[in-house]
């Protein structure tokens, strides 16, 4: 059991969005070792088809299991919306998504709920369905935001253009008088200072990262896998440029991490695993 407790939690996202989940894990579960994977070679996920997303996630999960993780958190709303159920059926370890924890938190905050998300997540109606299943009286408005992830990954958070884009996306939600805004993409927490400049203070902001970590903690306790041992250093792996990810993530981690390059072969078969390049 001690060996299982010592095994890392796997987190994956298309890029730096999952760092919001990572920071919450550091805060809530300081004894847990973590393996973070960013599929930066294929971001953004939000404009991909459902078939592509499922293919990508299967490849990542094959590699994650080869790294002997004890749990995987899909720190990516698009993957959670389009691949979570299929992946849970195919892999034996616990796999958590961010949508249901975010939906549960949203209905506790208000009844007029806006969701900003990638186009793929918005089109899936995953948040609308989850929220309405929990509270049929809640009203949900969704806006697809294709430009946010590229702007964040390009580190253009504080440019006037980014603020104008944010206003364009948020204005339809302000017009219907939402009382709650859900970050339907883990990247969007990085834009929170900008959102606070645009939104009235009466609107509650829901970051699903906070709530998926709470769910992960409960799951680990239930399975007897919560670590009571000191953690190992976090491993960072990417499919794209390690230096780009390291430099971009510095502002949220507070240090420049060591990042390993991981090669994702472009294969049709979903069973292909990933290989770490030496």
Curated annotation (Swiss-Prot):
The keyword Cell wall biogenesis/degradation applies. SUPFAM superfamilies: Aspartate/glutamate racemase. Keywords: Cell shape, Cell wall biogenesis/degradation, Isomerase, Peptidoglycan synthesis. It catalyses: L-glutamate = D-glutamate. GO terms for molecular function: glutamate racemase activity. GO terms for biological process: cell wall organization; peptidoglycan biosynthetic process; regulation of cell shape. InterPro entries: Asp/Glu/hydantoin_racemase (IPR015942), Asp/Glu_race (IPR001920), Asp/Glu_racemase_AS_1 (IPR018187), Asp/Glu_racemase_AS_2 (IPR033134), Glu_race (IPR004391). PROSITE patterns: ASP_GLU_RACEMASE_1, ASP_GLU_RACEMASE_2. This is Glutamate racemase.
């Amino acid at each position: 059991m001690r060996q299982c407790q010592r095994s890392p939690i796997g987190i994956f996202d298309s890029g730096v969005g999952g760092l919001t989940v990572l920071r919450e894990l550091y805060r809530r579960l300081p004894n847990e070792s973590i393996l973070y994977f960013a599929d930066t070679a294929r971001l953004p996920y939000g404009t991909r088809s459902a078939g592509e997303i499922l293919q990508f996630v299967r490849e990542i999960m094959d590699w994650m299991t080869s790294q002997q993780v004890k749990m995987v958190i899909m720190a990516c709303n698009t993957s959670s919306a389009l691949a979570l159920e299929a992946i849970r059926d195919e892999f034996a370890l616990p796999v958590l998504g961010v949508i249901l924890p975010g939906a549960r938190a949203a209905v506790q905050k208000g009844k007029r709920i806006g969701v900003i998300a990638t186009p793929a997540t918005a089109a899936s109606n995953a948040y609308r369905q989850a929220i309405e299943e929990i509270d049929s009286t809640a009203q949900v408005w969704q806006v697809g935001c294709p430009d946010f992830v590229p702007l964040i990954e390009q580190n253009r958070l504080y440019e006037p253009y980014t603020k104008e884009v944010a206003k364009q996306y948020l204005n339809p939600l302000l017009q219907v008088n939402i009382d709650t805004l859900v970050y339907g993409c883990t990247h969007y927490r990085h834009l929170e200072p900008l959102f606070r400049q645009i939104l009235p203070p009466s609107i509650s902001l829901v970051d699903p990262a906070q709530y998926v970590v709470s769910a992960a903690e409960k799951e680990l306790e239930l399975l007897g896998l919560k670590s009571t041992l000191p953690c190992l250093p976090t491993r960072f792996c990417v499919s794209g440029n390690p230096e780009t990810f390291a430099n971009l993530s510095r502002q949220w981690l507070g240090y420049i991490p060591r990042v390993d390059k991981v090669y994702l072969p472009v294969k049709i078969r979903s069973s292909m695993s990933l290989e770490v390049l030496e």
